[in-house]
């Protein structure tokens, strides 16, 4: 009969501190205790980088409801805290219902616009093909890209949730889609390092911007220079950002400003995506732009009172500038939210970075910083991205127009 080796049993039960220290010692050489309940000065064992060691340790700690993080000191200090879970992921049928509802709203909004600009054919069929479909496909692409990046980083985030309005409102929101939300709160997620956070957060705004800009230009090329035959009310004039305006002025000459008053639904879809991508890049708590700023500056520097005061003053300055120079209500609402969230009770915190010891590689830091600035500058929509054309019927005698 085969003999089994006896199992060594400790004479006393380990405390929780000793248990965590023993688990950490599999991947780190654990030194003296640091300040904090479960914290030690550590060094990654031979064959492990700090990134590998903290990732493997967190795989072990996940079952215990704990998460470990490394601070930027040299040697780093390992701190273990309770894992924050937040809300769960929506079931597939609920998520599908929200997407279906938003797509229907897009079809209605695009159909109304297609009818107002005199597009031939059924307006809702034109809307489905040239407005709802391009927007939905781009949003799905951005959502899937972010979901895969999150999954690669060990984060279960699910797909994004879009919200859209059923009409193009010149006063409240003239772009149809007005919201794109994540299912999981950022402050309840744990990202391995600052570079990974920047990569995840820039994925959606960059996708919307890079797809939306050429889509807007193609839609502008498809727009006729002559007005709709049944123009009975003031046209809604859109104002594009720098890149498409520059290219369209070279390709269409001076007609591009006229075409913006009855732009093709495909152009409106591209403009809507570009505007949404630009808004998501703004450094407002809760938006990807603020989390990208946290990745670039570092969480500790980002949440410092000095940094928060500077951001608040900038937000307040923008709010005053918008109030004085623009009558575009959405900008006023967004600037107000930016000020309120910066120091409000419901301030949204950026994700927890579990490995601050490696910092942000300089080359990658410059690349992501440049990308963020480029999107903000090239996508700048101006104080009034859309406005009703004043005195559109000046010099015309409506009494001579045929009536139905």
Regions found by a protein language model. Give the residues of each.
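Hydrophobic transmembrane alpha-helices and their immediate loop junctions
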Residues: 1-404
